[in-house]
Amino acid sequence: MRRLAVIASLAWALGGCATVAPPPQAAIPVPLADAWTLQGRLGVQTERESLSGQIRWQHGGGVDQVLLTSPLGQGVARIVRDPEGVSLELPGQPVRRATDVDTLTRDALGYELPVAGLAWWIQARPDPLREAAVALGDDGRPARIVQDGWTIDYLQYGADARPRKLVVSRAGLEIRLVADSWQSAP
């Protein structure tokens, strides 16, 4: 009997030392380097038209270069944003320049492409310099960000915890982005 009491006491004492695994935490997207490249597919739906194609976005050193191509790989538009402003190249047209992307794309395309905000949103983060509302999903990752009149819905995350599918929308415009690959530049 005494032996049973010693074993029970020992088990109780050791049980108090047992560690409990912490609850699982949401997968936090791996921060990208200051320079990165995103390749994927893009769909744009406006009240007048529906477009689809591919996107190659290089970001780094205060410069964004966005190349939009048709599903067959032909260049449709090239947007370059740097500290001096932004330029837009469309086939068969002179290069257009402006101080900001919103104005330039609105004038040239008839709708704004939020390149400055997208640089943050595609990383599942709001622009830290602007007010935003962030709704988290059950997994603790952003499910929706609302910022600057845009709503960003995160439909799927990749194995690396980075957004894979997202929808960016505002009245009369919906942009669907599927990130096929991310690369951090050296």
Curated annotation (Swiss-Prot):
It is a lipid-anchor. Its main location: membrane. It comes from the Bacteria. It is found in: Cell outer membrane. Gene3D superfamilies: Lipoprotein localisation LolA/LolB/LppX (2.50.20.10). InterPro entries: LolA/LolB/LppX (IPR029046), OM_lipoprot_LolB (IPR004565). A lipid is attached at C17 (S-diacylglycerol cysteine). A lipid is attached at C17 (N-palmitoyl cysteine). Residues 1-16 form the signal peptide. Keywords: Cell outer membrane, Chaperone, Lipoprotein, Membrane, Palmitate, Protein transport, Signal, Transport. One of its GO terms (cellular component) is cell outer membrane. SUPFAM superfamilies: Prokaryotic lipoproteins and lipoprotein localization factors. GO terms for biological process: lipoprotein localization to outer membrane; protein transport. Belongs to the LolB family. Plays a critical role in the incorporation of lipoproteins in the outer membrane after they are released by the LolA protein. NCBIfam families: lolB (TIGR00548). Monomer. This is Outer-membrane lipoprotein LolB. It comes from Thiobacillus denitrificans (strain ATCC 25259 / T1).
